[in-house]
UniProtKB/Swiss-Prot annotation:
Stretches the record annotates as Disordered: 1-52
Protein's name according to its UniProt entry: tRNA (guanine-N(7)-)-methyltransferase
InterPro entries named in the record: SAM-dependent_MTases_sf, tRNA_(Gua-N-7)_MeTrfase_Trmb, tRNA_methyltr_TrmB_bact
Xref: SUPFAM superfamilies: S-adenosyl-L-methionine-dependent methyltransferases
Organism: Streptomyces coelicolor (strain ATCC BAA-471 / A3(2) / M145)
Gene3D superfamilies attached to this UniProt entry: Vaccinia Virus protein VP39
Length: 271
């Protein structure tokens, strides 16, 4: 989560080589593509941008990445219990901006592990620094495309939740196909979410909110947690961001969506 929409810069596949103005590089996953190669080509979990890395962020990346970082390379299935050092539930957050809200949520719920994925190098360094200063052992930072992370590196049913806060709305009609929350993405995410896991999305772009509501409502693997359907009130566990507060002061509407992964009933045996 950030103070603006998530349009992260593509970072180096290895953060030991931190570049303030490096060329964008994207991790190449295996050729096998059960979710469909067309889906991956037109939808990524990020939009590249360039930003400067401060000395403090670079220091955090150099020191802490070997301890709390995960490169999304598509080469292995991650043992989440080994990654976090415990078997507590893991929530995947896609796009976290500078990480302030991620840190606040981790501090408020120490019994839940947060795997925060982004490619914005300054944000990665900032979140690692926050985790160290605030002593938050339940945060791990993943560098790369969350689509590859979901498809190639997370085991089926391994996630207790998914958070997508203020993703790029791609407001132009011809770019709507690039929005993250689409049926194909939800189908992929559903395979990695345990039954009962909650997908929590938030956006201040009303047309995107309506699209999110439509595709989540129509998807057979999810059900709205709001009685009667519709948008959810902002839950107390999601802090108000600075960006969000500024938008609310200007009369902007922020919509939250909370959908639960459905437990499908097994068909009765024949006979």
């Amino acid at each position: 989560m950030s103070d603006s929409h998530h349009t992260p810069e593509a970072a180096s596949a290895s953060l030991r080589h931190v570049r303030a103005k490096g060329e964008p590089r994207f991790p190449d996953g295996p050729k096998a593509d059960p979710a469909g190669s067309h889906f991956e080509r037109r939808i990524r979990s990020f939009q590249p941008r360039r930003s400067r890395v401060t000395a403090g962020q670079a220091d955090a990346l150099q020191r802490l990445w070997p301890l709390w970082g995960l490169d999304i390379d598509g080469r292995r299935v991650v043992d989440l219990a080994e990654l976090f050092g415990n078997a507590r539930p893991v929530v995947l957050e896609i796009g976290f901006g500078m990480g302030e809200t991620t840190a606040r949520m981790a501090a408020a719920d120490p019994d839940t592990n947060i795997l925060a994925a982004d490619v914005h190098t300054p944000g990665q360094g900032n979140l690692l620094g926050l985790a160290e200063r605030q002593e938050l052992p339940n945060i791990r930072v993943a560098n790369g495309d969350a689509i590859i992370l979901l498809r190639e590196m997370l085991a089926p049913g391994s996630l207790a939740g998914l958070r997508v806060y203020f993703p790029d709305p791609w407001p132009k009609k011809r770019h709507h196909k690039r929005r993250l929350i689409q049926p194909e993405f939800l189908t992929l995410a559903a395979t990695r979410l345990a039954p009962g896991a909650v997908v929590h999305c938030a956006t201040d772009w009303e047309p995107y909110a309506e699209q999110m509501l439509d595709v989540l409502t129509a998807h057979p693997d999810f059900e709205n947690t709001v009685p009667g359907g519709g948008f959810a009130p902002r839950p107390e566990h999601r802090p108000l961001t600075r960006f969000e507060g500024q938008g609310l002061d200007k009369g902007h509407v922020v919509n939250d969506l909370l959908f639960r992964r459905v437990q499908h009933k097994e068909p009765p045996p024949n006979g």
